[in-house]
From Swiss-Prot:
Organism: Janthinobacterium sp. (strain Marseille)
PROSITE patterns, alphabetized: COMPLEX1_20K (PS01150)
Bilayer topology annotation: Peripheral membrane protein
Lineage of the species this protein comes from: Bacteria, Pseudomonadati, Pseudomonadota, Betaproteobacteria, Burkholderiales
Entry protein name: NADH-quinone oxidoreductase subunit B
The reaction(s) this protein catalyses: a quinone + NADH + 5 H(+)(in) = a quinol + NAD(+) + 4 H(+)(out)
Binding positions for [4Fe-4S] cluster per the UniProt entry: 37-38, 102, 132
Length: 158
């Protein structure tokens, strides 16, 4: 059924959960936490070729204005407290995308003494984007997977 047929009737019915989740998926504002070479691919995804703005994804410079954090690159032990602090400053509900092999599990530097073996040891991760570095298409797919996850969540407690 097309939307034109629904609007001719004069009303649309839905649940509050679906409406709230629809608005959340259409206006995701990520906080960029670029730590290494994966950040270049993240910038590439935000540029004109892939244009994340068409999905409602607008990069924000402040954690208080964002609801998604994209951790892109190698997370060192010295940077881990800053990552947690920025995550704690984000408003609820908040989601995390781990981008790249280094953010997912330490990557090439897994056995280094100064590298955290996955950002999921510091913050809860919702979507993992594999690759070294992952392509802009992979990040775009990860964002769409996060949108699907948000659509499936129950917003209002039952």
């Amino acid at each position: 059924m097309a939307i034109e047929g629904v609007l001719n009737e004069g009303f649309v019915t839905t649940t509050a959960d679906k409406l709230i989740n629809w608005t959340r998926t259409g206006s995701m504002w990520p906080m960029t936490f670029g730590l290494a070479c994966c950040a270049v691919e993240m910038m590439h995804a935000g540029a004109s070729r892939y244009d994340l703005d068409r999905f409602g994804v607008v990069f924000r410079p402040s954690p208080r204005q964002s609801d998604v954090m994209i951790v892109a690159g190698t997370l060192c032990n010295k940077m881990a407290p800053a990552l947690r602090k920025v995550y704690d400053q984000m408003a609820e509900p908040r989601w995390v995308i781990s981008m790249g092999s280094c953010a997912n599990g330490g990557g090439y530097y897994h056995y280094s003494y100064s590298v955290v073996r996955g950002c999921d040891r510091i913050v809860p991760v919702d979507v993992y984007v594999p690759g070294c570095p992952p392509t802009a298409e992979a990040l775009l797919y990860g964002i769409m997977q996060l949108q699907n996850k948000i659509r499936r969540t129950n917003t209002i407690a039952r």
